[in-house]
C-alpha cells in the first residue's frame, strides 16, 4: 500500500491530519480514541510491511479491520 492509500483508510477510521513531522512524515490523530500515528508520506512508494503493521497497531486497529476500511 502507498502512503496515500494508508491515509485514506485512516481517514475512514476517524483519523485527521494533526501536524507535519520531520521530513516527509505526517502525524494523524483520532479525536474519538485519542490515538496518534505517524505515516511516512513518500509519494508513489509502498510502505514496508513492518512499518504498516506499526501504523495499524498505533491506530488501535486489527489488520482485518484496517483492510476492510
What is each residue range found by the language model?
Residues 17-50:
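A short, structured beta-strand/loop element
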Residues 8-10, 18, 59:
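Short linear sequence motifs
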Residues 8, 23-25, 68:
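Intrinsically disordered, low-complexity segments enriched in glycine/proline and serine/threonine
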Residues 1-14:
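Polyanion-binding surface elements
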Residues 4, 43-69:
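C-terminal structural segments of small proteins and small subunits
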Amino acid at each position: 500500500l502507498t502512503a496515500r492509500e494508508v491515509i485514506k483508510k485512516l481517514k475512514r477510521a476517524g483519523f485527521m491530519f494533526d501536524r507535519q513531522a520531520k521530513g516527509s512524515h505526517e502525524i494523524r490523530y483520532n479525536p474519538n480514541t485519542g490515538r496518534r500515528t505517524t505515516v511516512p508520506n513518500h509519494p508513489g512508494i509502498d510502505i514496508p510491511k513492518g512499518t504498516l503493521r506499526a501504523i495499524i497497531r498505533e491506530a488501535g486497529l486489527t489488520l482485518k479491520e484496517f483492510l476492510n476500511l
